[in-house]
Amino acid sequence: MSIKPLHDRVVVKPIEADEISAGGIVIPDSAKEKSTKGEVVAVGPGKPLDNGSVRAPSLKVGDKVIYGQYAGSSYKSEGVEYKVLREDDVLAVIG
C-alpha cells in the first residue's frame, strides 16, 4: 500500500470481527457489523494550527484503535479495505 495521509489524518486497517460467536454460532457476512477496531498503518505529519505551527500526531503506526462506526472514508487497495480518519475520529487506543 502506498498512501500518505495529510495533516491530522491516519490510515487504519480494520480488524475483522470474529466469524463465530461466543456461543459457537457461525455469523454470516450479511449479519456482521462493520468493524470499529483497527491498526494504524500510516500517520500524517500533524494538524496545522492557526499560529503556523503543527501539532504532532499522538498516534503512531502499529497502534490498535477504536473509532466511530461511521467515521472516515473507506479506501480499497490491492483487495484490502482501509479507513482514512481524522485523528479526532479515533475514540481510544487499545492496550
Curated annotation (Swiss-Prot):
Please give an example of a GO cellular component term from this record: cytoplasm
Q: Where is the signal peptide?
A: none
Cross-referenced InterPro entries: Chaperonin_GroES, Chaperonin_GroES_sf, Chaprnonin_Cpn10_CS, GroES-like_sf
Main localization is cytoplasm
Q: Which Pfam families match?
A: Cpn10
Asked if the Swiss-Prot or TrEMBL record annotates the protein with the keyword Transcription regulation, the reply is no
The lineage's top-level taxon is Bacteria
What is this protein's name? Co-chaperonin GroES
